[in-house]
């Protein structure tokens, strides 16, 4: 995203006040939205489209670490992950990187889906929901 800022929206309801924070807001999406103590990350992709799936996975996981840190959270608080792979032959290589990154005993709910991604060079995309 080219725009790096945080926007907040405070909505007063009948019984409570709700805070909605958007991070890195662009024309089409925000990289992260925080609401009611839950962090929602947009699908994260690698910067280097020429890299192999393991390198791209490390880049994506570093982005996730950075974004969660901005919201005051970390990977131990991840609730759910959806991993998108255009080629399921990359499943084992991706899992090796994932297993080295995720804290032992802190694995979240997870699904891995084969899907065509937005650009042909993307070998992995990861979407995360985490506790703040």
Segments predicted by a language model, with ranges:
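N-terminal presequence-like segments and the immediate start of the first folded domain
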Residues: 2-79, 85-132
């Amino acid at each position: 995203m080219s725009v790096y800022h945080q926007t907040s929206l405070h909505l007063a309801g009948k019984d409570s006040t709700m805070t909605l924070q958007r991070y890195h807001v662009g024309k089409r999406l925000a990289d992260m939205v925080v609401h009611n103590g839950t962090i929602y990350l947009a699908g994260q992709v690698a910067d280097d489209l020429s890299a192999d799936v393991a390198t791209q996975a490390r880049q994506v996981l570093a982005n996730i670490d950075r974004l969660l840190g901005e919201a005051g959270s970390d990977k131990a608080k991840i609730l759910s992950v959806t991993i998108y792979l255009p080629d399921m032959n990359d499943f084992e290589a991706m899992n090796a990187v994932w297993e080295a990154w995720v804290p032992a005993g802190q694995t979240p709910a997870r699904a891995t889906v084969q899907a065509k991604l937005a650009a042909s060079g993307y070998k992995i995309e990861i979407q995360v929901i985490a506790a703040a």
